[in-house]
Amino acid sequence: MHEFELLLVVRPDLTEQSVKQVIEKAEEYICRVGGKVSKAENWGLKRIAYEINGFDKAYYMLIMYSAPYVSSKSLQEIIKEDKDILHHMIIRQ
């Protein structure tokens, strides 16, 4: 198992409940590919460096997890399908 950080940039027009659901879905995705979440943080609504899909602000979320290395590619494919996530980045620790 390897340690990873998943940074999510989420649509700013979601309700607080919807933002929580995005975190829950991401944690579910991680578990589905064989990982285990160790920490999840909602950094809140922040201005982004450039517009994405017409938005100049977005919610930032950081999820730290451990998983087999091969699962990261599967996780990326799942995340790409989620319309609430504007951008994501997975970093191996």
Q: Residue spans of the language-model regions?
A:
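Long, contiguous binding/interaction regions
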Residues: 1-58, 66-93
